[in-house]
């Protein structure tokens, strides 16, 4: 398996569902979780959600060097949009990489524009800490135990 578009974990359909947008997929699946998926699951549950769709700016599964510029993103965009439309909130959790990598910054901006074009802007939240200054990735020590949003 070279790409993953969605990882879906739903435990209570009566509660709100979130779409979490991170950078790229891990090797997690429905049963085996990596650290990122574990922190997402724990915090989504603590925030009162009934589950989540994990989607990524890039769909290629890779444990080595990231090749952000060499991926076709059209299919992935459709999956992101599909999940966003059926979710109560869209949580952007890409961390600081968009600040330091122009390709990633442009990709994130294009996803935000896509969501805005589809009238989903009001659903967007950014994962942050109590200072509400920066966007964090779920692995960041400051947000591992408690999520805040801006």
Predicted regions and their residues:
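Active-site and ligand/interface coordination hotspots across diverse enzymes
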Residues: 1-34
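Residues at the starts of beta-strands that form the adenosine-phosphate
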Residues: 17, 50-51, 89, 123
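A short, flexible beta-alpha/helix-coil linker loop
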Residues: 24-27, 60, 97
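A short mixed-secondary-structure module that forms the rim of ligand-binding clefts
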Residues: 26-48
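Short connector loops at secondary-structure junctions
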Residues: 50-66
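Glycine/proline-rich loop-helix segments at beta-alpha junctions forming the active-site rim
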Residues: 62, 68-150
């Amino acid at each position: 398996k070279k790409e993953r578009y969605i990882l879906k974990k739903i435990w209570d359909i009566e509660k709100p569902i979130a779409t979490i947008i991170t950078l790229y997929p891990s090797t997690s699946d429905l049963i085996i979780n990596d650290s990122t998926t574990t922190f997402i699951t724990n915090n989504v549950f603590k925030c009162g959600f009934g589950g989540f769709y994990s989607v990524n700016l890039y769909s290629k599964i890779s444990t080595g060097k990231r090749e952000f510029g060499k991926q076709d993103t059209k299919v992935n965009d459709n999956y992101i949009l599909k999940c966003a439309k059926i979710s109560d909130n869209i949580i952007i959790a890409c961390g600081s990489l968009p600040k330091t990598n122009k390709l990633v910054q442009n990709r994130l901006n294009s996803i935000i524009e896509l969501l805005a074009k589809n009238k989903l802007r009001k659903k967007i939240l950014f994962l942050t800490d109590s200072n509400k200054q920066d966007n964090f990735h779920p692995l960041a020590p400051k947000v591992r135990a408690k999520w805040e949003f801006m």
